[in-house]
């Protein structure tokens, strides 16, 4: 039997099945609601489904005594019948339980019953850099430094403990509520037993595979440096360096070292990427060299980032005075995809922050074309008419939206539409197509002109011209606070901070049966009047969240709805959504209120 530090993983063959044949999905037992560690007698309540990957399903689990919340990775033993499967799981647990570092996912124990192995891990509520990448594409340079520095510190710790991760990628770099990076998923990790050992085998296919692994020449710590190079490239450029639509072609490019860094990338960043992506492993920098590179030593690294960065770029205060003027350019915030540069208004006090427009990467229609295509595909297969519907298989909690509208009030006959986002910030889209947002601290303000230029101020200091709008904003805020029930807002977002920027309401309209709201980060929300159900569509995650009559919140990948089907109620709302997105698309960009009667 495989052992983990003196403890056996006991896996018995299923009744009526010879050893080594995993059970079919229908024979997999139900995961219990209360998980009991037989050794410590600790009891955990299984809560929200967090996602699945490989053999495992992940749930939020709560220690019933301490009320601490963890992530529970649950693996059916029917998936661990073959010796290599068992050994892989044993190695993963043995490595992870030996680690303890701020930037490595915390290990809090493991146990088993007759049907499952349970691994108790630190909960990272903000998912991973993969979801951030899907929503944001390229991030700002200070953000890239922030995420990379923490990844490097975590990897430095691994290497000092003779552990090679071997699968560093965006999806394995998790984020907690404080937006701190935690390296996770040690399924492909290995321990170096002696100096100079070169590993020859690697089960599975890492995302950012190094050329020496492809060449089966033997590999060591340098594979993690290669992966960090790929991660850095992806964060700054918005796509991986060797990515093609064909795996064979991608591997060919890796072997030939065929990639190019776009000209707009900072030369210091380009130089560091090129060092990490050298074909010869011994020519790459070591993990200890990386943070001494000038990309990190001469560039601004924020001490923390707001959770708003998960979906919109932050705003950066002008960098500390010790930093060279030429390095200040990438530090200002951005509102990508708009026609006009973001400039500081002369009429606004000097406290406001200077804004700058980077290269636009977002489409002018804020991803409505992509959303229309996604809805057309899902509706074409008639997902509610499948012989067998397994809607729960289409669930993807990692795609939960960061922001949605939790309250709204229509005063457009006089002033505009007031709304509250799920983080308790409040905005008004005025009839003159300007927007004003008050952050959840009740003090910070974001003002967006008709041409989409942004200004930042606060309720204590603002130009006289905004007095009426700020008074109206406060009126809307008080009205919604006193009279309206909050929609689906049981997910508690973290306090914003001085770098936060919020998405704003771009366009809206009402029909006889619903209100349609389009946010500047691409999200489209439809609230149905009759039954108070809601759908929230995200084109970047290609996902839909459905808040049903019971106010239960579920998020599904549209491609998985195509595959597994969905209930009639959701299918009819997706059909309606397609018509509404067409209407949004046909309206003029920047028009605050679209006339609609459907």
Curated annotation (Swiss-Prot):
Gene3D superfamilies: Phosphorylase Kinase, domain 1, POLO box domain, Transferase(Phosphotransferase) domain 1. Residues 487-501 are annotated as: Linker. ATP binds at residues 50-58, 73, 122, 169-172, 185. This is Serine/threonine-protein kinase PLK1. The modification Phosphoserine is found at residues 25-26, 260, 326, 340. The active site is at 167 (proton acceptor). A motif (D-box that targets the protein for proteasomal degradation in anaphase) lies at residues 328-331. It is found in: Nucleus; Cytoplasm, Cytoskeleton, Microtubule organizing center, Centrosome; Cytoplasm, Cytoskeleton, Spindle; Midbody. Residues 185-212 are annotated as: Activation loop. Residues 404-482, 504-586 form the POLO box domain. Interacts with plk1 and kif2a. Interacts with fbxo5. One of its GO terms (biological process) is protein phosphorylation. It comes from Xenopus tropicalis. Its EC number is 2.7.11.21. GO terms for molecular function: ATP binding; protein serine kinase activity; protein serine/threonine kinase activity.
